[in-house]
A protein has these predicted regions:
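Basic, short loop/linker segments at the boundary and entry of helix-turn-helix/winged-helix-like folds
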Residues: 1-21
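Electropositive nucleic-acid engagement tracts
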Residues: 5-11, 28-129, 205-210, 215-232
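Eukaryotic intrinsically disordered and solvent-exposed regulatory patches
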Residues: 8-9, 21-23, 32-34, 69-75, ...
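Short, charged amphipathic recognition helices of the HTH superfamily
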Residues: 26-38, 191-195, 275
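Short, well-ordered loop/turn elements at secondary-structure boundaries
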Residues: 30, 42, 80-83, 143, ...
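Beta-strand cores of modular interaction/reader domains in eukaryotic scaffold and signaling proteins
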Residues: 34-35, 86-88, 93, 148-150, ...
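Active-site cores of enzymes that catalyze phosphoryl transfer or operate on phosphate-rich substrates
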Residues: 86, 118-156
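Non-catalytic regulatory appendages
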Residues: 136, 151-153, 157, 161, ...
Length: 619
């Protein structure tokens, strides 16, 4: 050791990999890092502080700084600027609170936590500032909207590219305008970045925002819709269309999060308002519940079907897993054939995105099989007079499946035909909004109920945690009621060479024939012969009828439970508005002051927790 030779660690130069590892250890446990450093050396904690002080302040809203961050992100990983990049967007609950923030660049104070851009504080008096907010119509932000940028390659963490404060009443047009502003910053540049996908979950607001985005850029002439066609195998129906969006001179596709789709399809199956009629077979919740009664052989847990967490990724994965599929084949009666087919078809649809060891030709077959199966299902219901709103998946699920199908096909077309360097591998599981949920989870591990100012403090410090997650190989598949499970960074079984081989148009037409034959064969097993029925389903008069109590939407945040901090702040706000001078006793006024001090202490505690974690960017 150096100390044995009378030497210290001053002035030593450490390899970047060692520096990064020390940084990660410091984030996890400062005490453990101090012990490690006393034996093996490493930067001081103050050195990491100095490195962090050189990092630019992260700002809210869409600004030109987003391009600089994205460019530096690509440079840090040696990634070419013309390489494909993926954007993910999602939102989560935010603690409604206004906090002061000093900007050292402009040398001004701003109020953080209001919907939209930060508001400059121009009054010294709190009453005058409150009046300013009332006059301008500002409201507190109740939701955080966050965009990530992803280099879609193995073991590369995402980058938080932008955040914005919104409210639950923010409409889809406003969300679309934010997306358009970000695309303009990144793509309308002298050296534009190559965005190939923008992904989100399947919430209604997100799907509507994508539609508004397309309508906006097309109406202004900054974008156009390109349509690729695949010949329909039945020879009678119109060709399959794959829409692409050319915006700011580049082509991208709109996709949905595949894991969100899997949870939506599970929730549809568990809905008491629906019973899936698949020819001679009916599929419903009780069939899945019966599987869990076989405790000796069931691949499912009781919590997967009873008092279930609708956001549990692992439970949805277990339902559509090969183990559950094998159980339905080997241990259930033939009357459950509909359940087997449902799990097979739509489980394969998600696997087309999530599988790490299949070729793109197999993925094409899997997504097209799901499309043809769904179209034939609609045709059967129409022919039999069954209303879709009771015997088919929900409209939301139907739309999400269509977007998944066209999204994967669109990614294949873009990688094959539109990239300057067509040798870039396509890894579909890196596209979507899973990285956004991962960022939200890391934030809540630091502060369970954060304000917008907390977000601005945390975002620059998440890089090390994301890097550590990308190197982690530990996943708890059997864990129950565990919420989100993030696997987009797992690539161990991925053969990179197979992801650079894309089928030609002629091959895709042939694969469509294979997928169509498989879909028709599955329907023949179910007792329906679709050979003489057009696969383009007709609309039904009853489609517009709403079914009560059928709320399969995933557009809710599992973290919105009221925390002590939120409850305390809400109570203080109500009391401040209802306070009338002279109407409150000295004791009550003293109690209110103590509650205010407690709220301030909670805020300071959260800030000190951030400092203890020492999540500094070692760049």
């Amino acid at each position: 050791m150096l100390s044995d030779r009378g030497r210290g660690f001053q002035g030593m130069h450490y390899p970047p990999a060692f520096d990064e590892w020390c940084h990660e250890l410091l984030c996890i446990s400062p005490a453990a890092y101090r012990l490690f450093r006393s034996k093996f050396g490493g930067r001081t904690e103050r050195s990491f502080h100095q490195i962090r002080s050189k990092t630019p302040i992260f700002r809210s809203s869409i600004t030109p700084c987003a391009y600089d961050r994205a460019r530096q992100y690509c440079s840090d990983y040696g990634y070419p600027l013309d390489g494909p990049l993926a954007i993910g967007v999602d939102d989560t609950a935010l603690l409604e609170a206004i906090r002061p923030f000093f900007d050292p660049v402009s040398n001004k104070w701003f109020a953080i936590g209001l919907v939209g851009d930060p508001v400059e504080v121009v009054h010294d008096s709190a009453d005058e500032f409150r009046q300013q907010l009332e006059d301008t119509g500002h409201e507190k932000a109740g939701k955080l909207r966050l965009w990530t940028l992803q280099i879609p390659l193995a073991h590369v963490p995402p980058l938080v590219i932008a955040v914005a404060a919104i409210s639950s009443r923010t409409n889809s047009s406003t969300l679309a305008r934010m997306d358009e502003d970000l695309l303009r910053v990144l793509m309308k540049h002298e050296e534009p970045l190559r965005i190939v996908s923008i992904g989100s979950d399947g919430a209604i607001s997100e799907r509507k925002a994508r539609q508004d985005l397309i309508a906006s850029v097309v109406s202004t002439g900054e974008g156009e819709i390109l349509v690729r066609h695949i010949k329909h195998p039945d020879g009678r129906s119109p060709p399959i269309t794959v829409p692409l969006l050319r915006v700011f001179g580049q082509v991208l596709t709109i996709i949905q999060d595949s894991k969100h789709c899997r949870k939506t399809l599970r929730n549809n199956l568990f809905s008491g308002a629906r019973a899936f009629v698949l020819a001679r077979h009916v599929t419903f919740y009780q069939q899945v519940r019966d599987i869990t009664n076989d405790t000796a052989r069931s691949p499912l847990h009781k919590r997967d079907v009873e008092r279930l967490d609708r956001q549990d990724d692992r439970a949805a994965e277990r339902l559509f897993s090969s183990a559950t599929l094998a159980y339905t084949i080997n241990h259930l009666e033939k009357l459950s054939l509909g359940l087997t087919v449902y799990l097979f078809v739509f489980g394969d649809l998600v696997d087309a995105y999530q599988s790490r060891n299949i070729s793109h030709t197999e993925r094409v077959v899997m997504v097209l099989r799901a499309k043809f199966f769904k179209d034939l299902w609609k045709a059967f219901l129409c022919e039999g007079g069954y209303p879709e709103q009771r015997y088919f998946i929900s409209r939301d699920a139907d739309s999400i499946v269509d977007t998944l199908v066209s999204g994967l096909l669109g990614l294949i077309f873009i990688h094959r035909d539109n990239l300057d360097q067509p040798s870039f591998p396509l890894m579909p599981w890196t596209h979507g909004s899973e990285s956004n949920e991962h960022v939200f989870g890391l934030m809540r591990s630091l502060i369970s109920d954060f304000t917008m100012l907390d977000v601005l403090r945390m975002v620059p410090k998440l890089t090390v945690r994301l890097q550590a997650a990308c190197r982690s190989r530990h996943q708890q598949f059997g864990k129950t009621a565990a919420g989100y499970s993030h696997t987009y960074f797992q690539h161990d079984d991925a053969p990179p060479h197979s992801f650079t081989q894309f089928p030609s148009d002629q091959t895709i037409d042939s694969l469509a024939k294979v997928a169509y034959d498989e879909a028709t064969y599955l329907w023949s097993l179910l007792g329906y012969d679709p050979c003489d029925v057009p696969t383009e389903p007709k609309s039904q008069p009853g489609d517009s009828v709403l079914v009560p109590f059928d709320n399969d939407s995933e557009d809710y945040d599992a973290t919105v439970a009221i925390s002590d901090r939120r409850e305390l702040l809400d109570a203080l706000e109500v009391s401040s508005h209802s306070f009338v001078p002279g109407s409150v006793s000295r004791t009550d006024k003293s109690n209110l002051n103590e509650y205010a001090f407690a709220a301030a202490a909670l805020n300071l505690q959260d800030f000190s927790d951030l400092c203890v974690y020492n999540l500094f960017l070692a760049r």
